[in-house]
Amino acid sequence: MHELYQPREIEAAAQTFWDEQKSFEVSEQPGKETFYCLSMFPYPSGKLHMGHVRNYTIGDVISRYQRMLGKNVLQPLGWDAFGMPAENAAIDNNVAPAKWTYENIAYMKNQLKSLGLAVDWSREVTTCKPDYYRWEQWLFTRLFEKGVIYRKNGTVNWDPIDQTVLANEQVIDGRGWRSGALIEKREIPMYYFKITAYADELLESLDELPGWPEQVKTMQRNWIGRSRGMEVQFPYDQASIGEAGALKVFTTRPDTLMGATYVAVAAEHPLATLAAQGNPALQAFIDECKGGSVAEADVATQEKKGQPTSLFVEHPLTGEKLPVWVANYVLMHYGDGAVMAVPAHDERDFEFASKYDLPIKPVVRTSAGDETPAPWQAEYNEQGPLINSGEFTGLHFQDAFDAIEAALVKKALGQSRTQFRLRDWGISRQRYWGCPIPIVHCDTCGDVPVPEDQLPVILPEDVVPDGAGSPLARMPQFYECSCPKCGAPAKRETDTMDTFVESSWYYARYASPHYEGGLVEPNAANHWLPVDQYIGGIEHAILHLLYARFFHKLMRDEGLVTSNEPFKNLLTQGMVNAETYFRMETSGKKTWINPADVTLERDAKAKVISATLTSDGLPVEIGGTEKMSKSKKNGIDPQTMIDQYGADTCRLFMMFASPPDMSLEWSDSGVEGSHRFLRRVWRLAQAHVGQGASGSLDIAALTDEQKAVRRSIHQAIKQASQDIGQNQKFNTAVAQVMTLMNVLEKAPQATPQDRALLQEGLETVTLLLAPITPHISHELWTQLGHNEPVIDAGWPVFDAHALVQDSLQLVIQVNGKLRGHIEMPASASREEVEAAARINENVLRFTDGLTIRKVIVVPGKLVNIVAS
């Protein structure tokens, strides 16, 4: 055994061993308990960042621990390889997205392997490869034929210069993020998943997920947003509108119906179109609205604007004429594109009515009283007894709901309805680097799904996009085809799918990644699924996790899987933060500086008191700790750390610095501390092994001092097992091992019994560290005399007898202040403990001249003598 800890050699040897032995390749073993551990797969951006390292280390620790419990553990990895960054890089560097993506995958795979992950690489999937997306297209065609996928016009953000659709987050201050063009709203045909058909189940089956953080489940509940309310019809005023009909609205507060003073419709609503005829001012406003964002969040925060239409509708209960306004805060794709406005009890309506001097009629008595004077108060939105509401006055919310519903049903102008905030999922993207949508457009047959024997529709990979719309729409060799039904000339769909589709089912493909008979091989899928432990960032709480849950139910209904949910347990890891530094330019702009280029001055307590730029010695500002990012230049390259300290040190620091679900603050001194600890472990083991094999331990013959050492060993096993297995608090498990190391380093090594006990202690340290620092553990286990690798060793089990103490050291207090200790047999009674405490010399000294009023004995811990 080499005298010094040499991580580079140790880690290379361990990884070579695992590769040659195919240690982490698994197959179905009926009768053996399975554990499927999965970390969210990475986008191949080019290089790993510390967030990746943390994510995959957490997953690897859990996987290795479960393997040591004797389970058949599956931990796969792959690549979420389609998406916008590849197109942008292609445009910037004039390189095909495929080439850029595959080069990044090769580099990042080597980086991941250098972390020593226990991954079954034989199951690797890459979502941009036809052998993967072929099955996505296969499922698409089946769902299209069932009506679960459908095509309709949708409102999108259109960039007239780049000739493409932009996501809401790509619209900045009304302009395209790349072109700077003013964005238009456009109606274009798009494909949608009917996720709303599963809204109730997606909501209710959240209750079947006790292993998910409550925060994530709450976010999904709010996103799905089930609300019970009423559909109310306001009959058209035929004199102003010129035809019979009714304006349909949905409200969750039908109790406030008697307070409606106007109605507002979206710019795209048919009544808005009708009113704009011959009204240039209204038409200009409608055009302005159509140029705005289609994002609900943007609409909520923007200034409320509107235009009157000169149209009226009738109040369904009173017959009163209410004016119709076009308002920018009403969205056509939400609800019915119209709202009944009750300014007294809705903040948006209040703001709008105040601005345009519309009537505000209070109809609910709230804790703010019967009136609703400006400014708006949150209390105005409360439920309470009705006022100013005719026959409904005095009724509370539920009674008012029922009575108003009965009155509307009687007049055939309303009914109760459950509505969801969740919209159907539009998946069409006018992008190149994505999975082609397998539809052919035929003038005779309409939209025809591509037959299974013609799948996959292959995306050409030798294309360099220029940013102006989709290249596929300009490639006749791609879109010109024959109709699969009638054989006539037809046109292939040139939109590609939202990349969230690929990540909605990848976890299932890992169960049978090479299966060519379908999306999954059902027996393999049902053997491994659902995933036992899923790990990823909280930023995926809504979209990815909701879409994956939806897809799992689609696969279940297609007979591909039998379970209802994809992920039993979810761990959302915290971010990796680091210190930031900057200089303020005269323009007011901050120029961020990499921490590696900064020299710090610290006080005696190691607190930073000043920072200077190393190159010029001049001061820089300390910006505080923030998430590692390219923009703030505070990222640390994992490869640099691995090259300098080894993967085990990085892994140990990541696990020790913070609980996995909390933010982790990067610390160079913390990394160095982790490295020093591994050197201590190596040094102690090297000294022990150098003295030759130790004999067997005679537990019956242990001295009190040896019993105390053994108690520390088994206390560490007990606590670490609880910390990792039950609580996923890897940081406290590491702390247990560090505490044990302190004991072992001080333990005597003079006798054969001492050496046998140290052998047990070092084996325990090795086993407890094995999931966290697998390379050094691999080497230590061999050096400690074992033939089988540590990955096949079982997790240690604590000996309950070793934890039993013959004697206990108790604290003695006088009037709450520490005055000494006494050693007592563990079996001593309360009376015996009190008697021993009373005659302790320190107690006698501090109670001299006082009367002992009370003696409090806390068994196994302390004695407090109260005297005055």
Curated annotation (Swiss-Prot):
Chain residues that bind ATP: K630
Sequence motif: 'KMSKS' region, positions: 627-631
Top-level class of the enzyme under EC nomenclature: ligase
Listed Gene3D superfamilies: 2.20.28.290, 3.10.20.590, HUPs, Isoleucyl-tRNA Synthetase, Domain 1
UniProt GO BP: leucyl-tRNA aminoacylation
Keywords carried by this UniProt record: Aminoacyl-tRNA synthetase, ATP-binding, Cytoplasm, Ligase, Nucleotide-binding, Protein biosynthesis
Family of this protein: Belongs to the class-I aminoacyl-tRNA synthetase family.
Protein name: Leucine--tRNA ligase
